[in-house]
């Protein structure tokens, strides 16, 4: 180290106000790359490329960084522990400190690596739709200036259809879509009423039509159904055209549900038009009815417009490990209690056996409703050991179901605040657009 106060045996690192004294020899082979680079500095300019400031008289180097994070990193490189996130510090901020000092994500403990991956994935999802530099990069390419207006128009259309709170037009479009979803659900539910079915059958009998037809009949419900299907079809086509990644669009669960819900209507119409009769429809009637009932999943489309459903979906996505753990708990307990209950109620004394517990699969139903404290009362133990086992089953169900609830609750609160923050940002942009 040729730069610095001559004769000084040590140097001082001042990181965010915390001072650390290191010998020159230790500085040469220090594990942190940024610190070890100080040993090769030959001028003040070289030093200021490594640190933020330098005091030649005291031989002190200043780093305007997070002192607590550096303390954790310093303990790790000195071999006094494993590298974990500092308490009360954002994972991304701590990772930024690691990159600054020359460490990588692989140096973190596995649990912290998972936390970092989850946070980076959530942050990417949160900000990817609001990336401001995409259009600028397109304009910088050859021919990008001419194509930029069309790209801006497509991006504006995409946000209008995909982000209901991004603009005033998006909110109006979302409101219309919600109305169509509600009307479609009401018609679908009403069509299963006996009086509704009888009236529809009487109308169809005038044209010698079958009892089931998915086509647009002359009754008002058929007209309403055709209008709703037309709206959803147009919406799906426009969203596909303006989407950035067509393959990713097709793979989305909501879009798959849209396709499965729309297709049966057009299949039935085409079969009626080309065959002129409904014999083919009768053969495929069960399949079409099942697919037609897929329209009930259109209610999930409301998740695009209501923050509560979005919070629920995001919570389930982030807590899939806890959900799997809960499922494993229930399956293990169900296997144990169902086998014991079948043995106590039916397997020991065949003469006075309980006919409801004839097999372990039959006992599984009783275990599930007991662990969840529902208790329909359709089957219950009659022997003393069986009733004792039932009490243990109920208590264990309460305990097992309560274990992962804390993690899921905290994740739900975090997801709710994140989505509220995003909604507030869009509301501010919407207010600006309305005022302008």
From Swiss-Prot:
Q: What membrane topology does the UniProt entry give?
A: Multi-pass membrane protein
Q: Which InterPro entries is this protein grouped with?
A: BTB/POZ_dom, Ion_trans_dom, K_chnl_volt-dep_Kv, K_chnl_volt-dep_Kv5/Kv9, SKP1/BTB/POZ_sf, T1-type_BTB, VG_K_chnl, Volt_channel_dom_sf
Query: Which coarse location class applies to the principal site listed for this UniProt protein?
Result: membrane
Q: Where is this motif: Selectivity filter?
A: 373-378
- The residue ranges crossing the membrane are 169-190, 221-242, 254-274, 285-305, 321-342, 388-416
In this entry, the parts of the chain located on the Extracellular side of the membrane are 191-220, 275-284, 343-360, 381-387
**What keywords are annotated for this sequence in UniProt?**
Cell membrane, Cytoplasm, Ion channel, Ion transport, Membrane, Potassium, Potassium channel, Potassium transport, Transmembrane, Transmembrane helix, Transport, Voltage-gated channel
The UniProt entry's GO biological process terms, in alphabetical order, are: action potential; potassium ion transmembrane transport; protein homooligomerization; regulation of potassium ion transmembrane transport; regulation of potassium ion transport
The GO terms describing molecular function are: potassium channel regulator activity; voltage-gated potassium channel activity
As annotated in Swiss-Prot or TrEMBL, what is the tissue specificity of this protein?
Expressed in the brain, liver, testis, small intestine, colon, thymus and adrenal gland.
Q: Which residues lie on this side of the membrane: Cytoplasmic?
A: 1-168, 243-253, 306-320, 417-436
Indicate yes or no for the key word ATP-binding: no
Location in the cell reads: Cell membrane; Cytoplasm
List the record's Gene Ontology CC terms alphabetically. Answer: endoplasmic reticulum; membrane; plasma membrane; voltage-gated potassium channel complex
Q: Which residues lie within the membrane without crossing it?
A: 361-372, 373-380
**What task does this protein carry out?**
Regulatory subunit of the voltage-gated potassium (Kv) channel which, when coassembled with KCNB1, modulates the kinetics parameters of the heterotetrameric channel namely the inactivation and deactivation rate. Potassium channel subunit that does not form functional channels by itself. Reduces the deactivation rate. Moderately accelerates activation.
| Family (UniProt) | Belongs to the potassium channel family. G (TC 1.A.1.2) subfamily. Kv6.3/KCNG3 sub-subfamily.
Entry comment, domain topic = The transmembrane segment S4 functions as a voltage-sensor and is characterized by a series of positively charged amino acids at every third position. Channel opening and closing is effected by a conformation change that affects the position and orientation of the voltage-sensor paddle formed by S3 and S4 within the membrane. A transmembrane electric field that is positive inside would push the positively charged S4 segment outwards, thereby opening the pore, while a field that is negative inside would pull the S4 segment inwards and close the pore.
Self-association or partners: how does it assemble? Answer: Heterotetramer with KCNB1. Does not form homomultimers.
How is this protein named in the record? Voltage-gated potassium channel regulatory subunit KCNG3
Q: Which organism is it from?
A: Homo sapiens (Human)
Question: Lineage of this protein's species?
Answer: Eukaryota, Metazoa, Chordata, Craniata, Vertebrata
